[in-house]
């Protein structure tokens, strides 16, 4: 299972001109299952709600329904506190990483280099060619 950080989901759904197609192609090319947390859902929906865009909001929720929803029980928050203290991560970043670790995900795809440094190999800046065996995500 690969945990998707909110930034990649946003690039995909909002069809970011530079990254949206790359994210879509990588997901389509992968045999892995993809998971997201309630935090990813929260972060993704903010822009659509703020702009009053129900079509975009629906596009996000339709994608959420096709991904594995990963719960965030109390141990995730306790691990996030450890990660914040040890690596100076912001709370949302620490929660993403802790959730991926808790669910024993094989990878956490992100574009955040701070997560790649703190994760000891779990998180990968998926928009860099070396992060997925030499191919761009």
List where the protein language model places each region.
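Alpha-helix capping/helix-boundary segments
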Residues: 8, 40, 76, 96, ...
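Active-site charged/polar residues at nucleotide-handling catalytic sites that mediate phosphoryl
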Residues: 30, 87, 103
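Acidic catalytic patch
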Residues: 66-86
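Short, well-structured N-terminal submotif of metal-dependent ribonuclease cores
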Residues: 1-36, 48-59, 126-137
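Conserved SAM-binding loop
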Residues: 12, 69, 89, 108
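Acidic, PIN/NYN-like endoribonuclease modules and their adjacent C-terminal/linker elements
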Residues: 1, 66, 97-137
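Short beta-strand scaffold positions
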Residues: 4, 35-36, 71, 91, ...
């Amino acid at each position: 299972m690969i945990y998707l950080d909110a930034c990649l989901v946003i690039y995909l759904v909002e069809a970011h001109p530079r990254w949206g197609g790359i994210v879509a192609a990588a997901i389509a090319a992968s045999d892995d299952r993809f998971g997201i947390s309630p935090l990813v859902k929260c972060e993704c929906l903010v822009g659509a709600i703020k702009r009053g865009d129900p079509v975009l909001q629906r596009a996000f929720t339709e994608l959420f329904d096709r991904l594995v929803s990963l719960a965030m029980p109390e141990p995730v928050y306790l691990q996030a506190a450890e990660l914040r203290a040890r690596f100076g991560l912001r709370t949302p970043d620490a929660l993403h990483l802790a959730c991926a670790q808790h669910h024993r995900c094989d990878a956490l795809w992100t574009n955040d280099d701070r997560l790649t440094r703190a994760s000891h190999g779990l998180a990968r800046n998926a928009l860099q060619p070396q992060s997925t065996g030499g191919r761009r995500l």
